[in-house]
């Protein structure tokens, strides 16, 4: 039996000043970054002081915001004088954020030792989960400034939408691992390290990495471990903040099976972690543009094709009818996909966002997307063509 989902009222969520963090999450390539920017713009138009933290945005999105070069610090987006709020935007610079953490939690001498370490410069920021960990760290920094009354977060692109929640723990697990503890062995030089219990393994690593790189890795681990308690404590504190009232997770999904499957996983995980879920943005849908049934459109097109009169008007009418029928088939497929999601998640509110016929390349286009996201009557069934 088909379940009609509740409508996600994003306008009310953005206008509610008790909400301080909105996290846009979901699989890669579903429109999270553009959605985050549109929500941030709308919140500023509601009178709020907003910063949107983006992850690797397309160049045209930066241009849409009126900023040529997004950086690791918030930059104010120029808005019309009548807009009562403020919008600031920034892009996560993973390396600079890592550098800031090292300097914050280490003394000057130790911090410089870490920053100059060759292993840190070439490998550290490539560790699995580092980007998500740094996104969490940057969110914590923004929250601690108490400068913004709303922070909108675009989570890192990933093949697995759960990485944003799992990465801080995974990076922590790596730093608790046997290899990490081996490199950390107190009072040992690299020569003694290689002749210890794990000598064969370390020799193999030395062959692959080179002895100097292995020495740099050991020095990096030993320097960083003294400060990692601060890293872990900060990440745990930020993670806890995401569970508090005032945070809203918005799961974004395209109208595709894999993206909706990821969305379902994320909804389940948020429930398990007791994290506040606002609802689902069902993005880039193709609703029917008129009430003409698909079968009648096909019949009418075939009738026109059969006419002996071969005019441009007849050919154009037949082509329009076929386009309508094709769009109708797409809409039916999207409705089936949404029905599966709502059947498995009947309590999750949904807003449907039709695919725009233009690129989001300026503030007006971003505002048009914000209109779709915050229009209360824009329920998922209508947006998907139901």
Curated annotation (Swiss-Prot):
Q: Which InterPro entries match?
A: Anion-transp_ATPase-like_dom, ATPase_ArsA/GET3, P-loop_NTPase
List, alphabetically, the Gene3D superfamilies matched: P-loop containing nucleotide triphosphate hydrolases
Q: What is this protein called?
A: ATPase BagB
Q: For this protein, what is any one GO molecular function term?
A: ATP hydrolysis activity
Q: Which SUPFAM superfamilies match?
A: P-loop containing nucleoside triphosphate hydrolases
> What does the record say about the knockout?
Deletion of both bagA and bagB does not reveal any conspicuous growth defects in vitro. The double mutant is fully virulent in the tuberculosis mouse model. The double deletion mutant is not hypersusceptible to arsenite in culture medium, but it is significantly more susceptible to nitric oxide (NO) and it exhibits a glycerol-dependent recovery defect following mouse infection. The double mutant is hypersusceptible to extracellular methylglyoxal, suggesting that the glycerol-dependent toxicity is due to heightened sensitivity to methylglyoxal generation.
**What is the annotated quaternary arrangement, including any partners?**
Forms a heterodimer composed of BagA and BagB. Interacts with Rv1509.
Organism (species): Mycobacterium tuberculosis (strain ATCC 25618 / H37Rv)
Question: What PANTHER family does the record point to?
Answer: ANION TRANSPORTER ATPASE-RELATED, ARSENICAL PUMP-DRIVING ATPASE ARSENITE-TRANSLOCATING ATPASE
Domains as described in the record = Binds nucleotides asymmetrically. The two ATPase domains of BagAB are spatially separated by the large central cavity and they do not physically interact with each other.
- EC number of this enzyme: 3.6.1.-
CDD domains xrefs: ArsA
Keywords, alphabetical: ATP-binding, Hydrolase, Nucleotide-binding
Which Pfam family, just one, is annotated for this protein? ArsA_ATPase
Family membership, please give it. Answer: Belongs to the arsA ATPase family. BagA/BagB subfamily.
EC class of the enzyme, as a word = hydrolase
Q: Which domain of life is it from?
A: Bacteria
- Notes on how activity is controlled: The ATPase activity of the BagAB complex is not stimulated by antimonite, an arsenite substitute, suggesting that BagAB is not a transporter for this family of elements.
Q: What does this protein do?
A: Component of the heterodimeric BagAB ATPase complex, whose two subunits are actively involved in ATP hydrolysis. The ATPase activity is required to mediate resistance against nitric oxide (NO) and elevated levels of glycerol.
Q: Where are the transmembrane segments?
A: none
List of residues binding ATP = 29-34, 283, 354, 356, 359-360
């Amino acid at each position: 039996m088909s379940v009609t989902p509740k409508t996600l009222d994003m306008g009310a969520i953005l206008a509610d000043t008790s909400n301080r963090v909105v996290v846009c999450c979901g699989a890669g390539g579903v429109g999270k970054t553009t959605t985050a920017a549109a929500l941030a713009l709308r919140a500023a138009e509601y009178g709020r002081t907003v910063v949107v933290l983006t992850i690797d945005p397309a160049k045209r999105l930066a241009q849409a915001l009126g900023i040529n070069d997004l950086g690791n610090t918030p930059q104010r987006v120029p808005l019309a004088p009548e807009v009562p709020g403020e919008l600031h935007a920034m892009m996560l610079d993973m390396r600079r954020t890592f550098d800031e953490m090292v300097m914050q939690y280490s003394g000057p001498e130790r911090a410089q030792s870490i920053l100059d370490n060759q292993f840190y410069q070439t490998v550290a920021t490539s560790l699995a989960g580092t980007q998500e960990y740094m996104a969490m760290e940057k969110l914590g920094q923004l929250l601690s400034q108490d400068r913004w009354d709303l922070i909108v977060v675009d989570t890192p692109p990933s093949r697995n939408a759960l990485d944003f929640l799992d990465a801080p723990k995974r990076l922590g697990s790596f730093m608790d691992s046997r290899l990490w503890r081996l490199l950390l062995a107190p009072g040992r030089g690299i020569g003694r390290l290689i002749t210890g219990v794990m000598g064969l393994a370390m020799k193999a690593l030395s062959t692959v990495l080179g002895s100097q790189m292995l020495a740099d890795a050991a020095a990096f681990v030993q320097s960083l471990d003294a400060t990692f308690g601060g890293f872990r404590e900060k990440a745990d504190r930020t993670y806890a903040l995401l569970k508090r009232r005032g945070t809203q997770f918005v799961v974004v999904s395209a109208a595709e099976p894999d993206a909706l499957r990821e969305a379902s996983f994320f909804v389940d995980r948020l429930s398990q972690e007791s994290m506040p879920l606002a609802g689902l943005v069902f993005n880039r849908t193709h609703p029917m543009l008129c009430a003409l049934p698909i079968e009648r459109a096909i019949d009418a097109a075939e009738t026109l094709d059969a006419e002996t009169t071969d005019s441009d008007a007849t050919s154009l009418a037949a082509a329009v009818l076929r386009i309508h029928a094709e769009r109708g088939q797409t809409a039916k497929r999207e409705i089936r996909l949404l029905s599966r999601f709502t059947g498995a998640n009947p309590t999750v509110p949904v807003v449907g966002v039709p695919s725009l016929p233009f690129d989001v390349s300026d503030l007006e286009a971003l505002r048009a997307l914000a209109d779709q996201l915050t229009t209360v009557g824009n329920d998922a069934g209508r947006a998907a063509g139901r």
